[in-house]
Curated annotation (Swiss-Prot):
<feature type="disulfide bond">
    <location>
        <begin position="74"/>
        <end position="85"/>
    </location>
</feature>
<comment type="similarity">
    <text>Belongs to the neurotoxin 19 (CSTX) family. 01 subfamily.</text>
</comment>
<dbReference type="InterPro" id="IPR019553">
    <property type="entry name" value="Spider_toxin_CSTX_knottin"/>
</dbReference>
<keyword id="KW-0732">Signal</keyword>
<feature type="disulfide bond">
    <location>
        <begin position="55"/>
        <end position="72"/>
    </location>
</feature>
<dbReference type="Pfam" id="PF10530">
    <property type="entry name" value="Toxin_35"/>
</dbReference>
<feature type="propeptide">
    <location>
        <begin position="21"/>
        <end position="44"/>
    </location>
</feature>
<protein>
    <recommendedName>
        <fullName>U3-lycotoxin-Ls1a</fullName>
    </recommendedName>
</protein>
<feature type="disulfide bond">
    <location>
        <begin position="48"/>
        <end position="63"/>
    </location>
</feature>
<dbReference type="GO" id="GO:0090729">
    <property type="term" value="F:toxin activity"/>
</dbReference>
<keyword id="KW-0800">Toxin</keyword>
<feature type="signal peptide">
    <location>
        <begin position="1"/>
        <end position="20"/>
    </location>
</feature>
<keyword id="KW-0964">Secreted</keyword>
<feature type="disulfide bond">
    <location>
        <begin position="62"/>
        <end position="87"/>
    </location>
</feature>
<dbReference type="GO" id="GO:0005576">
    <property type="term" value="C:extracellular region"/>
</dbReference>
<keyword id="KW-0960">Knottin</keyword>
<keyword id="KW-1015">Disulfide bond</keyword>
Length: 115
């Protein structure tokens, strides 16, 4: 039994040492890569399509609201043959955002009363 325990401790020690070395190598090698990805993400975020604007050129370019991303919704106007696409917020997400806002305000009041 002592041999199994000693072998287990040795195995855990070797595993933790090797994983720590791998993490150090990963952190040093990919730090610059991570910064470049963050810069690209910031640049991409500036190109979003505002709510109720045309999104037919890129249906995944709608901006985010407070909690959720808007959705590109396409429809045919009455009496027209051309498809129109605009960024819109689905009603269920709108209601969820309102409920979250009310919960935040109520939480602030509770904190004020008891804090």
């Amino acid at each position: 039994m002592k041999f199994v325990l000693l072998f287990g401790v040795l195995l855990v020690t070797l595993f933790s040492y090797s994983s720590a070395e791998m993490l150090d190598d990963f952190d040093q090698a990919d730090e610059d890569e991570l910064l470049s990805l963050i810069e690209k993400e910031e640049a991409r975020a500036k190109e979003c399509t505002p709510r109720f604007y045309d999104c037919s050129h890129d249906r995944h370019s709608c901006c985010r609201s407070e909690l959720f991303k808007d959705v590109c919704t396409c429809f045919y106007p009455e009496g027209g043959d051309n498809e129109v696409c605009t960024c819109q917020q689905p009603k269920h997400l709108k209601y969820m955002e309102k409920a979250a806002d009310k919960a935040k305000k109520f939480g602030g009041k509770i904190k004020k009363w008891f804090g």
